[in-house]
């Protein structure tokens, strides 16, 4: 009977080293060992590992969903299928397209040739319900059209209190003030537009949300109160005054709202503002044209140099 025994190591020969094992990429270090751990596993643990390995199944990766064909089609005006459904006020079709495109921000915020998104068109056509579904699906309230108007600008300009309410209710509080203060390419905020059109309910709602009653147009510095005086809208003046505007704020030309009442027919507006305006801003400033005419000499130095001009042999007299 043969017994298993470890083979004897070859005797060391002086001046001769035993051969070293090699591995791919270089020699193995003397103490390098590789232990899978299988030898130290119990029989039951080993069988459990085998069963788990046998249960592994690789599922084939599903191909990415192909976009709907209708989502890629555009008209010559740059309108998508959703733009058209909203323009033609096809409510059921619009809602179905919105449902299928939910979360697709690129499609929902696509701008046509007038830079209008579906949300712009929903507001223009006064479809507040469609606007609400668009916002829930992921439409952006900050996108501007070719005039720089956001959907909220348009809603305020049209006086649609329902659309204004829907748009602002789906806006986070920290973002709402930025939306209210946004100006279009004419420099008008939403409050300016509602004031110009005289929509008192919209004006009051915007002010209740925190719209800046003292916001100035960048072109000439008029506030909503200046605009109300220009429009001779006494009801709007009364509404704005209730919300504590700075009645002494002047335009870039230096005019207070009270000073704009001079020469106007509506005396009640002048009476409302007179008690609130400081005395120095109740008097009209002197015209710059009058001041310049008084200070400038009748002739310039260049004109006085040529005092011997003749036409047709006759000397000109100044």
Swiss-Prot record:
Phosphotyrosine carried by residues: 46
Q: What top-level branch of life does the organism fall under?
A: Eukaryota
The residues joined by the cross-link Glycyl lysine isopeptide (Lys-Gly) (interchain with G-Cter in ubiquitin) are 21
- Annotated compartments: Cytoplasm; Nucleus
Give the family from UniProt: Belongs to the NF-kappa-B inhibitor family.
Enumerate composition-biased segments (Basic and acidic residues): 17-44
Tell me the lineage of the source organism: Eukaryota, Metazoa, Chordata, Craniata, Vertebrata
Sorted alphabetically, the keyword list is: ANK repeat, Cytoplasm, Isopeptide bond, Nucleus, Phosphoprotein, Repeat, Ubl conjugation
Cited function: Inhibits the activity of dimeric NF-kappa-B/REL complexes by trapping REL (RELA/p65 and NFKB1/p50) dimers in the cytoplasm by masking their nuclear localization signals. On cellular stimulation by immune and pro-inflammatory responses, becomes phosphorylated promoting ubiquitination and degradation, enabling the dimeric RELA to translocate to the nucleus and activate transcription.
Question: Where are the annotated ANK repeats, by residue?
Answer: 114-143, 147-176, 186-215, 220-249
Source organism of this protein record: Gallus gallus
Q: Which GO terms describe its cellular component?
A: cytosol; nucleus
Q: Indicate where the modification Phosphoserine is found in the sequence.
A: 36, 40
Predominant localisation class: cytoplasm
- What modifications does the entry list under PTM / processing? Phosphorylated at Ser-36 and Ser-40 by IKKA/CHUK and IKKB/IKBKB; disables inhibition of NF-kappa-B DNA-binding activity. Phosphorylation at positions 36 and 40 is prerequisite to polyubiquitination and subsequent degradation.
Its protein name is: NF-kappa-B inhibitor alpha
SUPFAM superfamilies, A to Z:
Ankyrin repeat (SSF48403)
Name the organs or tissues of expression.
Highly expressed in lymph node, thymus followed by liver, brain, muscle, kidney, gastrointestinal and reproductive tract.
What Pfam families does the record tag this protein with?
A: Ank, Ank_2
* GO terms under biological process: negative regulation of canonical NF-kappaB signal transduction; regulation of fibroblast proliferation
PROSITE patterns given in the database record? ANK_REP_REGION (PS50297), ANK_REPEAT (PS50088)
Q: Is Cytoplasm one of the keywords UniProt gives this record?
A: yes
Q: Spell out the residue ranges making up region: Disordered.
A: 1-44
Q: Does the keyword Ubl conjugation apply?
A: yes
Picking any one GO molecular function of the record gives:
protein sequestering activity
């Amino acid at each position: 009977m043969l017994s298993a025994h470890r083979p004897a190591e070859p005797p060391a020969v002086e001046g001769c080293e035993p051969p070293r094992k090699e591995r791919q990429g270089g020699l193995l270090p003397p103490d390098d060992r590789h232990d899978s751990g299988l030898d130290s596993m119990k029989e039951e643990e080993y069988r459990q590992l085998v069963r788990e390995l046998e249960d592994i199944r690789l599922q084939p990766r599903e191909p990415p969903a192909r976009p709907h064909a209708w989502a890629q089609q555009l008209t010559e005006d740059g309108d998508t299928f959703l733009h058209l459904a909203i323009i033609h006020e096809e409510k059921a079709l619009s809602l179905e397209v919105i449902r299928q495109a939910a979360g697709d921000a690129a499609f929902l915020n696509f701008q046509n040739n007038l830079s209008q998104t579906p949300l712009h068109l929903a507001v223009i056509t006064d479809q507040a319900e469609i606007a609400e579904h668009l916002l829930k699906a992921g439409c952006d309230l900050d996108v501007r059209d070719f005039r720089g108007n956001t959907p909220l600008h348009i809603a305020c300009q049209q006086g649609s209190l329902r659309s204004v309410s829907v748009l602002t209710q789906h806006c986070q509080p920290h973002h709402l003030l930025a939306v209210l203060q946004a100006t279009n390419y004419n420099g008008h905020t939403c409050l300016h537009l509602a004031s110009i059109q005289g929509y008192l309910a919209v004006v009051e709602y915007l002010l209740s949300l925190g719209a800046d009653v003292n916001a100035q147009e960048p072109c000439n510095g008029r506030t909503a109160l200046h605009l109300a005086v220009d429009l001779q809208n006494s009801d709007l003046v009364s509404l704005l005054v209730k919300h504590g505007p700075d009645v002494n704020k002047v335009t870039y030309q230096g005019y207070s709202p009270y000073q704009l009442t001079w020469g106007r027919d509506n005396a009640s507006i002048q009476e409302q503002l007179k008690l609130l305006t400081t005395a120095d801003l109740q008097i009209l400033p002197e015209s710059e044209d009058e001041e310049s005419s008084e200070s400038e000499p009748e002739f310039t130095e260049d004109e006085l140099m040529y005092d011997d001009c003749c036409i047709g042999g006759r000397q000109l007299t100044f």
